[in-house]
Amino acid sequence: LNPKYIINTHWHDDHTRGNEDLAKELSVKIVQHNASQLKNDLTVSDGDSIKFGCSELAVYHTPGHSKDSICLVGDGKIFSGDTLFVGNCGRIDLPGGSAKELYHGLFDVIANLSDDLVLYPGHDYGSSSTSTIGKEKQTNPVMQKMNEDSFVDRMGG
């Protein structure tokens, strides 16, 4: 295994602590969304791709949990950081959080992706460590069809 990048799905310390030291040790680049204020080597925006070996990850900007939250999609998988969990979604009560932005990330972006994508969230809070977008649309309370105002009320924000 020859890593090329460390990709931060958002700036929160539980996802980025130690990444600068690890990047130096492995001689790899740190990648994150251009809205992040953390030190990085490469920034990405919505619609960009990160290429490595024979693979490629498409970048989807999904703010809401934080301003710089991204999801990465490739090879039948979605790495959702703290935007979407199995059975839930990321908090909005931290700096940069926004229920309205999270609503649009979940319903305008993620809900329109293939139901077959295997979900790999940033934390294992659910009954399983992985799921699919289709299953989350069926069973995850935050992915049930609702309007923006209802979602914002549900999230308390």
Language-model segments: residues:
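Active-site HxH/HxHxD metal-binding segment of metal-dependent hydrolases
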Residues: 1-58, 138-142
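Histidine-centered catalytic micro-motifs
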Residues: 6-16, 60-68, 119-126
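A generic local structural motif
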Residues: 16-19, 45, 65-66, 104-108
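Short strand-turn motif at the edge of the Rossmann-like AdoMet-binding core
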Residues: 35, 62, 83
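Hydrophobic residues at beta-strand termini and immediately following loops
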Residues: 44, 62, 133
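Ligand/cofactor pocket segment of small-molecule handling proteins
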Residues: 49, 61, 71
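Metallo-beta-lactamase
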Residues: 56, 67-156
